[in-house]
Amino acid sequence: MAYSATQSKSGYQAGVKDYRLTYYTPDYTPKDTDVLACFRVTPQPGVPPEEAGAAVAAESSTGTWTTVWTDLLTDLDRYKGRCYDIEPVPGEDNQYFCFVAYPLDLFEEGSVTNMLTSIVGNVFGFKALKALRLEDVRIPVAYLKTFQGPPHGIQVERDKLNKYGRPLLGCTIKPKLGLSAKNYGRAVYEALRGGLDFTKDDENINSQPFQRWRDRYLFVMEAVHKAQAETGEIKGHYLNVTAPTCEEMFKRAEFAKELGAPIIMHDYLTAGFTANTSLAKWCRDNGILLHIHRAMHAVIDRQKNHGIHFRVLAKCLRMSGGDHLHSGTVVGKLEGDRAITMGFVDLMRENYVEADRSRGIFFTQDWASMPGVMPVASGGIHVWHMPALVEIFGDDSVLQFGGGTLGHPWGNAPGATANRVALEACIQARNEGRDLAREGNDIIREAAKWSPELAAACELWKEIKFEFKAVDTL
């Protein structure tokens, strides 16, 4: 029986619902305009997967635990989420992929905040579920067209920088905390003069007592302009404008613009999607590139059976707006299986991506010509990784070496030069038809013969490896 025996004089039955009767609809064919979601569901013992999947659909759309008389005032069948398919997760006990379709009318136009509030806002605390993970979403073109997306995109960025045919090189200034503004600017100048395209604030450098944001901006932009004049190349530094309030964030962004900064930075998860979308629109209006850091992502996406997969967070960022997004390295110190990583990298920068379960892509995604986001590979990488990084990420990426630049035994500028020489050698070898995956080490050794900076870097980091099995696998 779907409800308790309690009868109501108002024409409905009160009591606890059996979600399967309303929200499990295996005969439903999703519409082109539906938002689709794939959840990895681990039901509590004794809860059938159909009930668990239906509960997810209900609690993330129109459902509540009991029947209420106001149900009679609307067309619930039009607005409800529907669990239309359930598959057991291969190799796992009591885990299921539950596919849910949501009508487009459930979501506010142009609001990632509202979309996530609906789909994942409340259901993750549901008692009938032992664990729940949002693996993927399909955003219909009709909904995508309500979002601006990235402020500029990959091609516009290349045109602004006048740099083509290779990945861009970056460096995070270290130590991330504790430097005075003047010493921080000095490190920026040396790295840019040595051959890098960008330097970067780390995610947690905002405006602390040892270095207030205005002082940092002034010294950093002095360094950028000086390095630019000396090298003849366009340079930039990701000035972090993340702030306690949106008003303060825009104040910092405006000051960066006044100083001639070509790019600013934002921590999109800790600051929130509302702030990020607002900043992305400001960046488009003001012609400034937007670098996005994913600080806090692993709190949300690291566990295999609970949370939100990063491919969903990456899709949300593309909709909310950002020109760069950190994506892991595959070969460095941070978590990342190659197939899974390249799956969400393609979702960041390609216009049309086919479903491919081997890469964790559950739905075909048409981005409807929305500009792409450039993936940023950073975290524990050095010159020996360069061939693999170029082979894995291709030209439309930023390769960011923090310790791999500033840890050079001769200093920041030689560290930057070593990375630039290694990159140029790999690009030339690739363009000549050489196999970077097979001949990468030989290519680096050959280049090191005529670059003492690269030779010193090769000697320093020849034994450094991060060999841990990736957690993020299907």
From Swiss-Prot:
Necessary cofactors: Mg(2+)
GO CC aspect terms: carboxysome
Primary residence: other
Modified residues (N6-carboxylysine): K200
Protein keywords: Bacterial microcompartment, Calvin cycle, Carbon dioxide fixation, Carboxysome, Disulfide bond, Lyase, Magnesium, Metal-binding, Monooxygenase, Oxidoreductase, Photorespiration, Photosynthesis
Cross-referenced CDD domains: RuBisCO_large_I (cd08212)
Cell location: Carboxysome
Co-factor note (free text): Binds 1 Mg(2+) ion per subunit.
Reaction(s) catalysed (UniProt annotation): 2 (2R)-3-phosphoglycerate + 2 H(+) = D-ribulose 1,5-bisphosphate + CO2 + H2O; D-ribulose 1,5-bisphosphate + O2 = 2-phosphoglycolate + (2R)-3-phosphoglycerate + 2 H(+)
Known EC number: 4.1.1.39
Processing after translation: The disulfide bond which can form in the large chain dimeric partners within the hexadecamer appears to be associated with oxidative stress and protein turnover.
Residues reported in the UniProt entry to bind Mg(2+): K200, D202, E203
Signal peptide (from-to): none
GO molecular function: magnesium ion binding; monooxygenase activity; ribulose-bisphosphate carboxylase activity
Xref: Pfam families: RuBisCO_large, RuBisCO_large_N
Additional free-text comment from the UniProt record: The basic functional RuBisCO is composed of a large chain homodimer in a 'head-to-tail' conformation. In form I RuBisCO this homodimer is arranged in a barrel-like tetramer with the small subunits forming a tetrameric 'cap' on each end of the 'barrel'.
Assigned protein family: Belongs to the RuBisCO large chain family. Type I subfamily.
Assembly: Heterohexadecamer of 8 large chains and 8 small chains; disulfide-linked. The disulfide link is formed within the large subunit homodimers.
Protein name: Ribulose bisphosphate carboxylase large chain
Organism per entry: Synechococcus sp. (strain JA-2-3B'a(2-13))
